Amino acid sequence: MPELPEVEVVRRGLEDHMVGHTIVSATVLHPRAARNQLGGGPEIEANIAGLRVSAAKRRGKFLWLELIDAPSGETRPDLGLLVHLGMSGQMLIKEPDAPISPHLRAKIELDNGDEVWFVDQRTFGYWWLGDLVDGVPERVSHIATDVLDESADFSAIARNLKSRKSEIKRLLLNQEIVSGIGNIYADEMLWQAKIHPLQRADRLSLARLEELLQAGKDVMTKALAQGGTSFDALYVNVNGNSGYFSLSLNAYGQTGEPCGRCGTQIVRENFMNRGSHYCPNCQKRR
């Protein structure tokens, strides 16, 4: 599943290509693309035409387009089109005569003639049109801030983590504590901070927990600079190009490879129906 850096890459692309433009029409081609919308695809199609995109925003793994009523001159957005990429979703900028993808699920036509395609092979992603509450789509208002958010309070997040007796990796994957972190970046930030994924959070000092969050910010900033992590053609930017941070991974997917710090072989253990990758020497469980 695309994590924070991959979603941010898409958000930046949509910002470049959509902000300031008016939506001429929208077409939802597959019911699963609007499965969470009351009224389904027709509800989106009927209510989005004529609106102008004023901003592209993100929180964690969710992104949304802020929409304003262009004819009225309204400048304060109160409506948003939420986009969740799911496992394989892509938001692509296309010319009108582009060959149609067999996995095209929905599309938007802009006033400059460009089309914005939602392509989703596995159909876990979706669009949702709804109200913004304090600038965030109502549907994801419960999602926590992420480590790249300027408003993120690392001290407060660290205190929240320390108050829990669960494994630190399990907590990092909880989007209501800190958002945007999935399996890849959890492994990478734990490796950088030298913390075992099964270490109980309440046994870590507040200072160590803040170091871990800073490690997450550092790792994701580097990943973002490289276009995110792409293991196949499903994770791409709005122009269809893949990122290359997979070449810089230190833990995730590195089973049997020497640790970049000490040379010990990286190991993989099953955790929460997925794998945890770590160095048994650098990341000792305490």
From Swiss-Prot:
Active-site residues, record numbering mapped to chain: 2-3, 61, 274
Record protein name field: Formamidopyrimidine-DNA glycosylase
Stretches annotated zinc finger (FPG-type): 250-284
Role of this protein: Involved in base excision repair of DNA damaged by oxidation or by mutagenic agents. Acts as a DNA glycosylase that recognizes and removes damaged bases. Has a preference for oxidized purines, such as 7,8-dihydro-8-oxoguanine (8-oxoG). Has AP (apurinic/apyrimidinic) lyase activity and introduces nicks in the DNA strand. Cleaves the DNA backbone by beta-delta elimination to generate a single-strand break at the site of the removed base with both 3'- and 5'-phosphates.
Catalytic activity: Hydrolysis of DNA containing ring-opened 7-methylguanine residues, releasing 2,6-diamino-4-hydroxy-5-(N-methyl)formamidopyrimidine; 2'-deoxyribonucleotide-(2'-deoxyribose 5'-phosphate)-2'-deoxyribonucleotide-DNA = a 3'-end 2'-deoxyribonucleotide-(2,3-dehydro-2,3-deoxyribose 5'-phosphate)-DNA + a 5'-end 5'-phospho-2'-deoxyribonucleoside-DNA + H(+)
Residues engaged in binding DNA: 103, 122, 164
BP GO annotations: base-excision repair
InterPro entries, sorted: DNA_glyclase/AP_lyase_DNA-bd, DNA_glyclase_Znf_dom_DNA_BS, Formamido-pyr_DNA_Glyclase, FPG_cat, MutM-like_N-ter, Ribosomal_uS13-like_H2TH, Znf_DNA_glyclase/AP_lyase, Znf_FPG/IleRS
Domain of life of the native organism: Bacteria
Entry's Gene Ontology molecular function annotations: 8-oxo-7,8-dihydroguanine DNA N-glycosylase activity; class I DNA-(apurinic or apyrimidinic site) endonuclease activity; damaged DNA binding; zinc ion binding
Entry-linked NCBIfam families: fpg, PRK01103.1
PROSITE patterns registered for this protein in UniProt: FPG_CAT, ZF_FPG_1, ZF_FPG_2
Known EC number: 3.2.2.23, 4.2.99.18
Family: Belongs to the FPG family.
Any Pfam family matching the protein: zf-FPG_IleRS
Cofactor(s) essential for the protein: Zn(2+)
Record-linked Gene3D superfamilies: 1.10.8.50, MutM-like, N-terminal
Native species: Corynebacterium glutamicum (strain R)
Cofactor, free-text remark: Binds 1 zinc ion per subunit.
Keywords: DNA damage, DNA repair, DNA-binding, Glycosidase, Hydrolase, Lyase, Metal-binding, Multifunctional enzyme, Zinc, Zinc-finger
Assembly and binders: Monomer.
